[in-house]
Each structure stands twice: as structure tokens, then as C-alpha cells.
Amino acid sequence: MSGTARLGRNSAQTPVLRSLPVPDPTHAGPQPNENRTGPLPAVTIALPVLDEAAHIEACLRAVLSQTYPRIVEILVVDGGSGDATREIASTFPGVRVVDNPARLQSAGLNVALREARGDVLVRVDGRTTVAPDYVDRCVSALTRSGAALVGGPIEPDGTTWVERAVGAALTSKLGAGPARFRNTAASADWTDIVYLGAARVDVLCRLGGYDEAFSTNEDGELLYRLSREGGVWFDPTIRSTYRPRGSFATFMRQYFLYGIGRAATVRKYPASLRPRQLAAPLLVLGLLSPWRRKVALAYLAVVAAGVGTELREDRAAGAGMAIALPAMHLSWGVGFLVGWLRSRSRYDDK
């Protein structure tokens, strides 16, 4: 059965995007409403959420302030929130709340695909605040690049000490490596990862949507498939801010689960592995080896150098980064090793 049939899309619908020309994909800076020809693609905005009462109002206010003129629906796909997320979302006109019984983000995004009436699906998370021209720039980048998916950088916007420390770790070279999507100053280019972003609904459906076997890293798994379908385009003008986790414990749990998901992706697609992704699991193994003391001292020296750079810009965040970086690396590394073992039986025999 094809992905389109599985997701229940109307096969008679002809996406507007197919009628638009696909210019040179090396164009580095599409502008909103810049020389568009033909009808504008209809857009569905999808928010897969779970217990985001503290952030959903700001998120939806930003979504409802978009400059793009053809947003046909805003779907809040709720995974059974135990707080007031659903009630808050229901108070916004033009917002439709739909159920995600499986609770997972991958399942919630597939619910959005089945419900979508738009030609383009723009994903927004509950902890994210998008710029007013976010959708406009997503559609412009999709049209001009011809990519299967486009997105921009991640920009942490913490207010508490922990949130700022986590944000500093996320955007540092030690935390992010050379990843383009964590650098707001990076130039537009083809890439293997972006933050959230937008994709053509017909392409997503043809690929079968999100893999619901993934409880985390569902976006990374899909991005790998999309990179072979039409490519992933990074545009630094697609701007949004993200509220980091508010405690080191929840941050560590988040990255432990990310590590599990990344390992499952590598098991499924070995070619998706990047050398930098081995650093954290090798660190964990090194700390368990007979050379643990030397490994620990070398690692702490590297962290100290990275923290020193941040201290010159933000003393409080830099000090917190000394906790956030090891928390990030160790939890992700342990998660990767656990995920590697867990996913062995799922993919090794295929």
C-alpha cells in the first residue's frame, strides 16, 4: 500500500505547488512574496503537543499573526494533555484541536497529515514562537529551492538561569558541533537537518509519513528519507525561538531519549551516521574503561575551554553551561548506547 493511501489523502487533489516553477536551488535568499507566479500554495500548520499549557498561548498568538495570506487551517494535535493545553488552544478562533490517541509526536504528525487540507504542512512545536513571516519564508524557500523540506535555525530563548544555560549549550560548538541549523549566521544551503520546517504534503504522503516506531528522532528519521527524495534546504531567514527545558533533569531525559532515537535511525539507515555522533557514546565508553581518569580530565579540559568562551559573553549562562554540556553529552551518549542495543533485533535481521 502506498504512503498516500495509508495516510488517507484525497488522490484527486492536485497540489498547487506542482504548478509552480522550480528555480535554481542555489538561490541563497528567498524573500517573502518575492515575484511569485501562479496561485499561492494552501498551508496547514500542525502543532503536535502534550502538556504545553505554559507555552501554547504564546505559540498560537505567533501562529495567528502570520503574514502569509493562505493558511487554510491550524491543527493542534493533542496527545492527551493532563493540563490545560487543550482548553487554552480551544479558545483561539480558527484553531482546530484534534486527538492523538497514540500520544507520540510521530503519530500526531501523521494525524495532521491525514487531516491536512493544505498543499504544504508547516510544523510548529508548542514551545516555539515563530516570526510573523515564518510561513511566508517557508513557502518561498520551498518554491525556490525545489527541496522536499525547508527549515531554519534553532534559537533558544530562555528566561531562567537553567534555560539560558541549556540554550548556551545547545548553540555552542561543543554542543552542536558543525550543525548548520544551530547557527543563525549560517548561509542558506543544502543540509541534513533543520529545526521544524515545512514540507510538501504530497511528498510526505508518498513517503508514508512519519515512522511511528520512533518515539523520538522521528524528524531525523524522516529528514534522512527526504534528503534522498528532494533534499533538505536550510534558510537562516526562517526564524523562530524555542523555550529550552527548565531543569537539568528534564533536559537530561530529553537528550537520553534523543540518543535512543538517533541510534534507532542509524540502525535503520547506517549511512545516516555522522562521525560527530560517535563522540558522546565513545565518551561514555571511555569513562567506563580503565583509562577513565585520563578520559575525564581530557573531557573536562575541553568543556572548560568551551565554557570560557561563553563566560565572556554571559557569565551566568556560561557557568550553567559547565553543567549543561556534560548533562547533554552523557545523557545522549548513554541513550545512544541503550538505543543501539534495543534496536538491534528490529533492524539487524532485515
Whereabouts are the PLM-identified features?
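Conserved donor NDP-sugar-binding/catalytic core segment of glycosyltransferases
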Residues: 129-164, 168, 239, 243
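Catalytic donor/gating beta->alpha subdomain of glycosyltransferases that bind UDP-sugars
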Residues: 211-273
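Glycine-rich, basic loop-to-helix element that forms the pyrophosphate-binding segment
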Residues: 100-116, 137, 190
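Short, acidic, metal-binding catalytic loop of nucleotide-sugar glycosyltransferases
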Residues: 61-71
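A conserved acidic beta->alpha catalytic loop
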Residues: 62, 78-86, 125-129
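Cell-envelope/extracellular polymer assembly enzymes that use nucleotide-activated donors
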Residues: 41-44, 73, 221
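Short, flexible, basic/aromatic active-site loop/helix in glycosyltransferases
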Residues: 152-158, 167-196, 205, 263, ...
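Short aromatic/hydrophobic "clamp" motif used to bind/position activated sugar donors
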Residues: 121
